[in-house]
UniProtKB/Swiss-Prot annotation:
It comes from Streptomyces coelicolor (strain ATCC BAA-471 / A3(2) / M145). One of its GO terms (molecular function) is DNA binding. The gene is greA. Necessary for efficient RNA polymerase transcription elongation past template-encoded arresting sites. The arresting sites in DNA have the property of trapping a certain fraction of elongating RNA polymerases that pass through, resulting in locked ternary complexes. Cleavage of the nascent transcript by cleavage factors such as GreA or GreB allows the resumption of elongation from the new 3'terminus. GreA releases sequences of 2 to 3 nucleotides. This is Transcription elongation factor GreA. Pfam families: GreA_GreB (PF01272), GreA_GreB_N (PF03449). InterPro entries: GreA/GreB_C_sf, TF_GreA/GreB_CS, Tscrpt_elong_fac_GreA, Tscrpt_elong_fac_GreA/B, Tscrpt_elong_fac_GreA/B_C, Tscrpt_elong_fac_GreA/B_fam, Tscrpt_elong_fac_GreA/B_N, Tscrpt_elong_fac_GreA/B_N_sf.
């Protein structure tokens, strides 16, 4: 999944289905469970000193935030196939870069939004400084981006392949 222009998020059908399942769980069984926790904690008495109540309310807030995020994401999603394997850096691709052209100092990452993040590969969003710097470049190109401290940085695109995870 990747954010593209105009806040449209590109998703594979599999990713879309996974996020939709999560939303259905959060708006169904998870809401029922947290409501039951809050009700049980409320019955314990004084709410000002009721740690279980406050923990359940905090959990409820996190769940509702995730519901809003997923709803917005799925409403703006464009479901389609993975990007073409044409060597052009695009959302949904695994990119390998060399910092300052030094092929011994490389980084491989998935160019996608955080919902696509997994533990097996580092993920950078297309809106991040590095992501926006490499977006649209081809294998072999040198790309520039701005570091958080304002200094320019240069990378060479070594590989750009569709993500298959």
């Amino acid at each position: 999944m990747t954010q593209t222009s105009e806040n449209v998020t590109w998703l594979t059908q599999e990713a879309y289905n996974k996020l939709k399942e999560e939303l259905e769980y959060l708006t169904g069984p998870a809401r029922t469970e947290i409501s039951a926790k809050i009700a049980a904690a409320r019955e314990e008495g004084d709410l000002r000193e009721n740690g279980g109540y406050h923990a359940a309310k905090e959990e409820q807030g996190k769940q509702e935030l995730r519901v809003r995020q997923l709803t917005q994401l799925l409403e703006s999603a464009k479901v389609g196939e993975a990007p073409a394997a044409d060597g052009v850096v695009a959302p949904g691709m695994v990119v390998t870069i060399a910092f300052d052209g030094d092929e011994d100092d490389t980084l491989t990452f998935l160019l996608a939004s955080r919902e696509y993040a997994s533990s097996d590969i580092e993920t950078y969003s297309p809106q991040s400084p590095l992501g926006s710097g490499v977006l649209g470049h081809k294998v072999g190109d040198d790309a520039q981006y701005e570091l958080p401290n304002g200094k320019p940085a240069s990378v060479r695109i070594l590989k750009a392949e569709p993500y298959n995870g």
